[in-house]
Amino acid sequence: MPSFNFLKEAKVYIIYSGNQYNIDISSVSFSQTFTENSYSVKTLHNQKNVFDGSIINKANPANFEFTFPAIKDSDFVTVFNLLVDYEGFTNKLNTFDLYISTELDVFKIETCVITNGSFVIEKSRPLSLTVSGEASKLSYFGAKSDVTIPGSVQSRSATMRYNTNPVVTATLDSQALSNIVNVAVELQNDIEWNPYTTVHQALQVTSANNAMYPTDFVLKNRVLSGSIQRYVTERKGTIGASSNALALQSWDTSAPIVITAGEGSGGSFRGFSFDGNCSFTNRLGTGSVFTQSHDWRLIDNPTNLSSIISYTTGA
């Protein structure tokens, strides 16, 4: 009877700076495709050759995505840092290798870079973070019983402490927002892979083993944005008014924004926080209950983005 790889058995390991981090996940996906080019094989003497030939010598960047819980302990903070931080004093993002292991097989994804991070902030649901990205190469590493995932294994906390009932607060343009329905925050890292195809390399390709794979990239742009959805109540607010509700259908090109999502307060706070300056627009939503959404985008350019976004953990 054949053995199978089951998603529910999948475990994710990040290898970064020689260390191995086991990341608990609720979902994971990964893939890589190859570019196929066709060419005509029809000739004057073979008019029935109407099916084109094929050339495959180039791999597209691999893709991956996984979701992990934003617990109160520091077990998974490395993933957050890989999303946010630069590589040293450069403007490049950090790269890492990813291993996905089932009870049967192990798969390896090389030179990974996180291109998107979606902060899952919902009332009555534990905080979590979904990251997705691109990579150089996906390959089969081997049978689990035959291979060893590299890296110095990092210890884990004895118990997992979840942010099970996060308290969400938001201040926009120095006004505390009430009647919040939900909050969405997303960080996008726009990268572009350097050209990696040459005529010489193309002529040498004989299989997926020596195909042309992307190797390096540049960071083109970063966008931190989100929305704060609230119920429309009797307190509408007016433009320029010092109330706790901003005006409907208003906007601003420069306003301070502070969002926190987590448990505890002061030095005991554990969770996500966002503190910077943004532009925003306000739009009305006409569902069964009327809502308004403040759609915002960061306009600051800090030396370190971690001064704007933080994931606070601790005992």
Labelled PLM ranges:
Residues 1-315:
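Signature of extracytoplasmic/envelope-associated structural regions
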